[in-house]
């Protein structure tokens, strides 16, 4: 039993060391991240992503400030024959560009980092999602337009691989017109 507890402690410590090295946008400017974004790329090692990735398509995400100084993040995406919305609140931390979020519906905790953004073209984000003993990495690429340059797509894929994700974990989301005007 002691060995099992020690193993879990070492795994948690290793994860902390690895994820502590994820960069955050220098001089993060929250007011410039606000507004509408298109979900261009998604990468994850979660079982959910692997089982659903063939069905995933581009989505829209709108980021707005809350009255208490945090961020509301609402993603609208096509699901079967309808548009579905998923809302999260990104809670600010002491480090600009790093946020926390909880999903009571799914019982998961999220640590979100804005890795890199030029604010008017693209944003690269890194999320660690924890649910029970399961820890997953999510890398997301957003654009102000539905298409981004091949160089930015490569940057996203390279960053995802640097986080331990494989080609099979990485998806450039297929473009769609479904749900794009629902925002």
Swiss-Prot record:
InterPro entries: Calycin, Lipocalin, Lipocalin_CS, Lipocln_cytosolic_FA-bd_dom. The lineage of its organism: Eukaryota, Metazoa, Chordata, Craniata, Vertebrata. Might have a transport function across the blood brain barrier. Is supposed to have similar functions as a transthyretin which must have evolved after the stage of the amphibians in evolution. This is Lipocalin. Expressed mainly in choroid plexus. Much lower expression in other brain areas, and absent from liver. It comes from the Eukaryota. Disulfide bonds join 83-179. Monomer. The keyword Transcription regulation does not apply. GO terms for cellular component: extracellular region. CDD domains: lipocalin_L-PGDS. Its main location: secreted. It is found in: Secreted. Keywords: Disulfide bond, Secreted, Signal. One of its GO terms (molecular function) is small molecule binding. Belongs to the calycin superfamily. Lipocalin family. Residues 1-20 form the signal peptide.
């Amino acid at each position: 039993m002691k060995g099992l507890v020690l193993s879990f402690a070492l795994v948690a410590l290793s994860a902390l060391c690895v994820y502590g090295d994820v960069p955050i946008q220098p001089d993060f400017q929250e007011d410039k991240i606000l507004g509408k974004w298109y979900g261009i790329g998604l990468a994850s090692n979660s079982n959910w992503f692997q089982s659903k990735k063939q069905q995933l398509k581009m989505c829209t995400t709108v980021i707005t400030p809350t009255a208490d100084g945090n961020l509301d993040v609402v993603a609208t995406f096509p699901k079967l024959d309808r548009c579905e919305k998923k809302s999260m609140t990104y809670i600010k931390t002491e480090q600009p560009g790093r946020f926390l979020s909880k999903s009571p519906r799914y019982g998961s905790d999220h640590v979100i980092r804005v890795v890199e953004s030029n604010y008017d073209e693209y944003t690269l984000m890194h999320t660690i999602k924890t649910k029970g003993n399961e820890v997953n990495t999510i890398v997301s690429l957003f654009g102000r337009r539905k298409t981004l340059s091949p160089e930015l797509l490569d940057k996203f894929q390279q960053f995802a691989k640097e986080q331990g994700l494989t080609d099979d974990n990485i998806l450039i989301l297929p473009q769609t017109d479904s749900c794009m005007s629902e925002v």
